[in-house]
Regions:
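Alpha/propeptide regions of enzymes that mature by internal proteolysis
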Residues: 2-246
């Protein structure tokens, strides 16, 4: 297995001669103005943990989408990233999260505006595997319960760093500050590919805003004959050009 780190988009890669590959990213804003050497070290540690979680599944013969979900799980649970716990806050001070999971055969599931799902990528997977739909906006508590995914109060997702960033944005700072949308793409031993993305959006975004991450072809895309893509950046720009599909 080989690993590498690339900045400013913090990226980790694992691959082998068998063809299995896992690439993860912590987003374009993961090393922002609030970064310290200690925080950067924690980010790199969490990235390695995420890489290991997904890659071990690939080595055991698991399909690509399971490796993607496992890697994203670790990052959603780590408060340094803008996904799950540690998500950026909306203008009304809540965590409102999006996620998407897509496989190379064109099957896809996504959620937007979830505020109590502990791991939004699990909800995206549930939409893909348990419903006939592609995208759910602000699913009900009953729907979430039916999917069998874990939940938390919204307070669980909110960190002091995100509160500070929101206060700065609302006092005239950079309201479009990026905080590191996360993602993963994988290729399994059978040659199948998958992509997943999870995000809390942009600090101080309006309630109900939807970025590129949960939109197939915009922030997340997988096509067996071409490529698997997970994007990070300003979602509005990606949506306008259907960026992931253009790669």
């Amino acid at each position: 297995m080989t690993t590498s780190s690339v900045s400013p988009v913090t990226t980790e890669l694992a691959g082998s001669e068998t063809g299995i590959t896992l690439i993860i990213h912590a987003g374009a804003g993961s090393r922002g103005k609030h970064s310290t050497p200690e925080r950067i070290a924690q980010v790199e540690l969490d990235l390695q943990r995420a890489l290991d979680a997904g890659y071990q599944l690939l080595e055991s013969g698991a399909p690509a989408h399971e490796a993607v979900v496992a890697a994203i799980h670790v990052m959603e649970d780590a408060p340094e990233f803008n996904a799950g716990r540690g998500a950026a806050l909306t203008s009304d001070g809540i965590a409102q999260m999006d996620a998407c999971l897509m496989t190379g055969d064109g099957e896809v599931g996504a959620v937007t505006g979830v505020s109590t799902v502990k791991n939004p990528i699990d909800a995206a997977r549930a939409v893909k595997e348990q419903t006939k739909h592609v995208l759910f906006a602000d699913p009900t508590d009953a729907e979430i319960a039916d999917w069998g995914v874990a939940t938390e109060s919204n307070e669980y997702f909110i960190t002091e760093q995100r509160r500070q960033s929101l206060a700065e944005a609302q006092s005239g700072g950079d309201e479009w500050e990026k905080h590191g949308t996360i993602g993963a793409v994988a290729r399994d031993a059978e040659g199948n590919i998958a992509a997943g993305t999870s995000t809390g959006g942009i600090t101080n975004q309006m309630h109900g805003r939807v970025g590129d991450s949960p939109l197939p072809g915009c922030g997340t895309f997988a096509n067996q004959s071409t490529v698997a893509v997970s994007c990070t950046g300003i979602g509005e720009a990606f949506i306008k050009v259907v960026a992931a599909h253009q790669v």
